[in-house]
């Protein structure tokens, strides 16, 4: 934010401003310069230079974007989003998935979300954001150790040039072909990054949902023992709210390394159903159908029909609305499932009111069933035997 605006505010409310400055200094919150230092992409190929303040102004106005300042070469390796092999037309691992699903539990999800949302904010360039990502890494490692999987399964920090790091857990398979489950761990108060941002739904809910799926999946001896055909990764991204910064950095690296990512599923906001119920509509999950991979999205609908007790609805969220966009830009098939149709999703996000009390853990459990089915079915799917098809976006 500009110092001139700060000084005006200070003249009006000196006590409040003094407290603001105290918090800024005590927690090392870093804001960007006043000059246009950030290159953002608001649509495919449409870019503009903005200041840090202008980034948040755009977000407050509902504009989503990718901050491509450090990732202008993302997608430059010549990868094309493709269906080089067809995704399964039906689910085949019902016995194994249903057995593992019995381990999914709302109690750990609630305990983990209470802890995650207790951080004053998880703003990616603050000490709070660093501490919250440290907690995520610690918790994931605890899950691995409790499962007795620490000889094969790993969790590592993916550092960035800002304070908060991303976290990647890897379950090796028989091949390097990889299935990725993602959520973003950061939160933001769009009025000012220093203000409280519990981020219970956005995206604390997705963070703990995939954490619980990870815990349940490690109950499988075959998975832990490396018998899945494909490698499985769980990603907790930093700095989604700043323009998909963390996920772009990761997929930029994967693209340069020519990693073979077969599918990426994003879980961003999995707990709010009040908007749907208030509209007298049935509880459902929202399957995003714009800027996603059509074949993978079709498969997700099949997974929901097989493993969830509620239906899906198609919905749209626009360009760069979550981290799946980074995978897509790198040339990898990606998809996104949200808590409801987009227009019925949580109105409390990016404020101090994004609280646990407004969320349904039973609904989050449905997202867990879907994610578990998705990752197990594709983890054990032999892509080498499927038929080549056409790309559709």
UniProtKB/Swiss-Prot annotation:
Keywords: Aminopeptidase, Disulfide bond, Glycoprotein, Hydrolase, Metal-binding, Protease, Secreted, Signal, Zinc, Zymogen
The protein's required cofactors: Zn(2+)
GO terms, molecular function: aminopeptidase activity; metal ion binding; metalloexopeptidase activity
Residues bearing glycans: 176
Disulfide pairings: 317-321
Record keyword Hydrolase present: yes
Chain residues that bind Zn(2+) 1: 184, 202, 268
Propeptide residues per the UniProt entry: 19-84
GO terms, biological process: proteolysis
Family annotation (InterPro entries): EF_Hand_1_Ca_BS, M28_fam, Peptidase_M28
Cofactor comment: Binds 2 Zn(2+) ions per subunit.
The EC number(s) this enzyme carries: 3.4.11.-
Coiled coil: none
Binding site residues for Zn(2+) 2: 202, 241, 350
A cellular component term, taken from the record's GO annotations: extracellular region
Protein family (similarity comment): Belongs to the peptidase M28 family. M28E subfamily.
Assembly and binders: Monomer.
The protein's role, per its UniProt record: Extracellular aminopeptidase that allows assimilation of proteinaceous substrates.
Identification of the protein by name: Leucine aminopeptidase 1
Gene: LAP1
């Amino acid at each position: 934010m500009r110092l001139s605006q700060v000084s005006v505010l200070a003249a009006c409310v000196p006590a409040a401003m003094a407290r603001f400055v105290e918090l800024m200094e005590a927690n090392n919150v870093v804001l960007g310069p006043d000059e246009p230092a950030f290159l953002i992409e608001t649509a495919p190929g449409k870019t503009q230079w903005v200041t840090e303040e202008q980034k948040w102004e755009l977000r407050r106005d509902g504009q989503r974007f990718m901050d491509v300042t450090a990732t202008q070469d993302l997608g430059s390796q010549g990868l094309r989003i493709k269906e080089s092999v067809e995704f399964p037309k039906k689910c085949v691992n019902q016995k194994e998935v249903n057995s593992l699903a019995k381990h999914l539990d709302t109690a750990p999800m609630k305990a983990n979300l209470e802890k995650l949302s207790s951080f004053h904010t998880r703003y990616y360039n603050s000490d709070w954001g660093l501490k919250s990502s440290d907690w995520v890494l610690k918790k994931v490692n605890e899950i691995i150790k409790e499962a007795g999987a620490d000889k094969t399964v790993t969790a590592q920090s993916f550092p960035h040039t800002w304070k908060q790091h991303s976290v990647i857990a890897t379950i090796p398979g028989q091949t390097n072909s990889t299935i990725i489950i993602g959520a973003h761990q950061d939160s933001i108060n769009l009025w000012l990054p220093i203000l409280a941002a519990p981020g219970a739904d956005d995206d604390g809910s997705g963070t703990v949902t995939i954490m619980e799926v990870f815990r349940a999946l490690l109950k499988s001896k075959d998975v832990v023992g490396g018998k899945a055909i494909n490698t499985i990764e769980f990603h907790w991204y930093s700095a989604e709210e700043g323009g998909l910064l963390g996920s772009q950095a990761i997929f930029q690296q994967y693209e340069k390394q020519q990693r073979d990512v077969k599918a990426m599923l994003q879980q961003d906001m999995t707990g709010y159903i009040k908007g749907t119920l208030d509209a007298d509509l049935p509880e459902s999950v929202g399957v995003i159908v714009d800027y996603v991979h059509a074949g993978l999205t079709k498969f997700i609908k099949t997974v929901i029909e097989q493993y969830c007790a509620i239906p899906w609805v198609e919905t749209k969220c626009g360009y760069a609305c979550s981290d799946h966009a980074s995978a897509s830009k790198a040339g990898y098939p990606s998809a996104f499932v949200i808590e409801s149709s987009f227009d019925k999703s949580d109105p409390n996000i990016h404020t101090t009111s994004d609280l646990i009390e407004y969320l349904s853990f039973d609904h989050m459990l449905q997202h867990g069933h879907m994610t578990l089915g998705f990752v197990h079915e594709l983890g054990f799917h032999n892509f080498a035997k499927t038929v080549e098809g056409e790309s559709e976006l």
